[in-house]
Swiss-Prot record:
The keyword Cytoplasm does not apply. The gene is nuoH2. It comes from Syntrophobacter fumaroxidans (strain DSM 10017 / MPOB). One of its GO terms (cellular component) is plasma membrane. This is NADH-quinone oxidoreductase subunit H 2. NDH-1 is composed of 14 different subunits. Subunits NuoA, H, J, K, L, M, N constitute the membrane sector of the complex. Belongs to the complex I subunit 1 family. It is an enzyme of class 7 (translocase). It is a multi-pass membrane protein. One of its GO terms (biological process) is aerobic respiration. Coiled coil: none annotated. Its main location: membrane.
Length: 331
């Protein structure tokens, strides 16, 4: 009974810490992105709220909380109100399987530095990321707006299309690590990160994941010059904030998965494992921000052609090459 109680308390503590860090980092990723883009465009960026604009995320949160929460006339009220929560919740729940370091011993208990050490962690990731499609599609449909509906349809088609190349990019990593567990995959990279043996899979995964979370240059579902704000055109206040939160938590999820699958996870010299993982996540986030400030938005036909005609065939070829290499190494 005592062990069960202690295990439950440890789980609650891990959930609380991970959730708090995710929300805090998401808020300051917005600040980092605005500052980084400002420098790229020879501007100052946020500099009014606090020193260097560091209080700007808090000011933004207060503003969104104070905004009126409106529901458009003719909207499907229940679905309209639930859709942002689906997007934010799926993004937050995916982080449960990302490991932060090796097991630690505390008060005589062996505690894994991961919320849920599943032996099918990658399948869990794909299951939850697939559910995120419903939040986008239903939010667009329930808004009773043509702009929102078109954005929702685009978002659903884009996310479903790029899930294929995303999944195929991970197959070579699983073949090398011989496991679906993210902890096992990190441990398999103790000698060298998989980016050295799987550069093609790394490139396909990063491009597909950016399309999956609808970041520029793949933000067709919310293209401002065509659709207003796409599937969240009719949202205001904290419901709009939940869509925003989902995007920036997804940036952290993408950074965590890239670090775990290709960059060696928590492995690194001198610094603690958790610090190494955090550095790698921030590095991936900075690359995404740099891409946003550098590349123009694709046309919708270019977006679909890239996924179906380039990434998926390339991923299939990479799987065959990796399979032959793993088979040869096994012999």
């Amino acid at each position: 009974m005592l062990n069960w109680t202690a295990g439950f308390l440890v789980l609650i503590a891990k959930l609380t810490i991970v959730l708090a860090v995710l929300l805090l980092v998401a808020a300051y990723l917005v600040w980092l992105e605005r500052k980084f883009l400002a420098r790229l465009q020879i501007r100052y960026g946020p500099n009014r709220a606090g020193k260097f604009g560091l209080l700007q995320p808090i000011a933004d949160i207060v503003k969104m909380v104070a905004k009126e929460d409106t529901v458009p006339e003719g909207a499907e009220r229940t679905i309209f109100m639930l859709a942002p929560a689906v997007v934010a919740a799926t993004a937050l729940l995916v982080f449960a399987v990302i490991p932060f370091g090796k097991d630690v011993t505390l008060w005589g208990m062996k505690i894994p530095l991961v919320v849920a050490d599943l032996n099918v962690g990658l399948l869990y990731f794909f299951a939850l990321s697939s559910l995120g499609v419903y939040g986008v599609a239903l939010g667009g449909w329930a808004s009773n707006s043509k702009y929102s509906l078109l954005g929702g349809i685009r978002g659903a088609a884009q996310m479903i299309s790029y899930e294929l190349s995303l999944g195929l990019a991970i197959v070579p990593v699983v073949m090398q690590a011989r496991s679906f567990s993210l902890v096992d995959i990190v441990q398999a990279q103790e000698k060298y990160p998989f980016i050295l043996t799987q550069p093609v899979a790394f490139a396909i995964f990063v491009i597909s994941a950016m399309a999956e979370i609808k970041r520029i240059p793949f933000d067709l579902p919310e293209a401002e010059n065509e659709l207003g704000a796409g599937f969240h055109t009719e949202y205001s206040g904290m419901r709009f904030g939940l869509f925003f939160l989902g995007e920036y938590v997804n940036m952290q999820v993408l950074g965590g998965l890239v670090a775990v699958l290709f960059l060696g996870g928590w492995h690194g010299p001198l610094l603690p494992p958790v610090v190494w993982l955090f550095i790698k996540i921030v590095l991936v986030a900075l690359i995404m921000i740099w891409v946003r400030g550098t590349l123009p938005r694709l046309r919708y036909d270019q977006l679909m052609a890239l996924g179906w005609k380039v990434l998926i065939p390339l991923a299939l070829v990479n799987i065959m090459v990796t399979g032959a290499w793993v088979l040869w190494m096994g012999k």
